Amino acid sequence: MIALLFLLASTACSQDDNVTETEPDLVARARGIHERVITLDTHNDISTANFTADRNYTMALSTQVNLPNMEAGGFDVSWMVVFVGQGDLTPERYGDAHRQALAKFEAVHLLTEQIAPDRIELALTSDDVRRIIAAGKKVAMIGVENAYPIGTDLSNIELFHEMGARYMSLAHNGHSQFADSNTGERDEVWLHGGLSELGRKAIAEMNRLGIMIDLSHPSKESNMQALALTRAPVIASHSAARAVGDVSRNLDDEQLMALKENGGV
């Protein structure tokens, strides 16, 4: 939406200064842009409670994202997020988190394969996105926020890939088994000094499979190390510029320049 507003402003400024566009004119221009380009949201948190036969995204729920809103707003691609909050680094808690993550994967598959396959489809590649949109449907993609549910068994990364994950962050609000979180700035207590050895191995596996590394939430040191290691472009799915919003989970100029050099977004 920010990009759209910027484009509208840029376009309006290029017009004759003596020509004033009315609000209906601007709305029509915005709708025209939506009809010509693929619009996407790279981070849509979901609840499994909204993926049931009685309550789901075919309905006008109070959620920001649902099919009626997507269709009315000309919104094409929703990255639905498999998120499990950070817990203790123990086998028991890894198992609990893994089960919660699988339930969210299954919720997205339920929506796209059983509840509304005629209106929305899961995409695994950019070619899928174009094909689905050409067929007149909306697109779901899956990102993983916090690799904590992987546990210490890196074969779970391949399982998540098979279930549709195409990006994953290595930490959230709290240090994970893979990487330090930005939240370490609160007390300057760090667990790994960036990435753990397991985190370095996870990056190699994600590169092999084709899962983008998400820089949103890990610490600066974790992100800089990830950018140095990765062989593929990364994503900051829901971050802002720290120079504008000075909070620890935003990216400072050094990280943004490294992101540029990486070819990521």
Label every PLM stretch briefly.
Residues 198-265:
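Catalytic pocket-lining loop regions of alpha/beta-barrel enzymes
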